[in-house]
Each structure stands twice: as structure tokens, then as C-alpha cells.
Amino acid sequence: MAGGKGKTGGKTGGKGDSHVKTTKSHSAKAGLQFPCGRIKRHLRTITRQKTRIGAKASIYLTAVLEYLTAEVLELAGNAAKDLKVKRITPRHLQLAIRGDEELDTLIRATIAFGGVLPHINRALLLKVEQKKKGAKVEA
């Protein structure tokens, strides 16, 4: 019998599913982990539907947020590793952000349960060092 359907058979006429288009998210197309669609939705709600938002604006903003998050998490992970613990706490985030000059100027917010950075005024340190040097000279 002629007019066979091939190996796949069915209604496709033996052509298979090679022409079926798979859907890919904006995040996957851009190679990002953060959700571009959700960021775009938040942009729309923030502007209250009055401002037009370009197609690539949400992708760009998502990439910036992902980069900043990766940077902070890397520094906080290093701080946790230095303290020999395996879990990042708000204290590690605080140490990471305040330890980096650029992140410190960018993120001026108070981090809950972050504590404070240890700091001794230079004038106090100089007096202590001068006393130690004076004691060494006399001896």
C-alpha cells in the first residue's frame, strides 16, 4: 500500500515534531537567573501604567540586580568563610557591604541584626602607640 505515514505515523504525515517551536523565557534568552517578566510587571506597577517601558528595560534592570546580588553574596560568603561558618547571616552581609567602599555608598540602609563595624578612633590609637614607643625608648 502506498502513501505510508512513515515511522512516526499519526496526523502529521510522518514529518515528526521537528518544526514545533519551544517557548523560552526572556530570562533564559538573556542568560539570566532572575525573572525578567516579574521585574517588568513591577516596573509597570511602580509607574502606574503612565509611562511606556521599553522591551529591554526590564532585561537590563534584571541583569543589574542579578550582578549586584551576586557581588554582595560573594563578599558575604567570603566573610562567612573567614569566620569558619557555612551559613550567611545578616552580620556577614553587613561586614561585606560596609567593607566594600562602593557598596557602602550604594547601600546606605540599615541591615537588621547586622551589628556595627568595629572601629577605634585614630586619635586614640596614636596616643596608645606613642605611650608604647615612649616606654621602649626609656628602657
Swiss-Prot record:
Keyword Nucleus on entry: yes
Xref: CDD domains: HFD_H2A
Pfam families to which the protein is assigned, alphabetical: Histone (PF00125), Histone_H2A_C (PF16211)
A GO biological process held by the record: heterochromatin formation
One MF annotation (Gene Ontology) recorded for this entry: protein heterodimerization activity
SUPFAM superfamilies reported in the protein's UniProt record: Histone-fold
Region described as Disordered: 1-28
Processing and modification events after translation: Acetylated once deposited into chromatin.
Biased composition (Gly residues): 1-13
GO cellular component terms, A-Z: nucleosome; nucleus
PTM-bearing positions, type N6-acetyllysine: K5, K11
Statement: the UniProt record of this protein carries the keyword Magnesium: no
Top-level taxon of origin: Eukaryota
InterPro entries on file: Histone-fold, Histone_H2A, Histone_H2A/H2B/H3, Histone_H2A_C
Keyword entries, A-Z: Acetylation, Chromosome, DNA-binding, Nucleosome core, Nucleus
Protein's cellular compartments: Nucleus; Chromosome
Self-association state and partner proteins as the record states: The nucleosome is a histone octamer containing two molecules each of H2A, H2B, H3 and H4 assembled in one H3-H4 heterotetramer and two H2A-H2B heterodimers. The octamer wraps approximately 147 bp of DNA. H2A or its variant H2A.Z forms a heterodimer with H2B. H2A.Z associates with the VPS72/SWC2 subunit of the SWR1 chromatin remodeling complex. Also interacts with RBP1/DNA-directed RNA polymerase II largest subunit.
Family stated for the protein in its record: Belongs to the histone H2A family.
Function: Variant histone H2A which can replace H2A in some nucleosomes. Nucleosomes wrap and compact DNA into chromatin, limiting DNA accessibility to the cellular machineries which require DNA as a template. Histones thereby play a central role in transcription regulation, DNA repair, DNA replication and chromosomal stability. DNA accessibility is regulated via a complex set of post-translational modifications of histones, also called histone code, and nucleosome remodeling.
Name recorded for this polypeptide: Histone H2A.Z
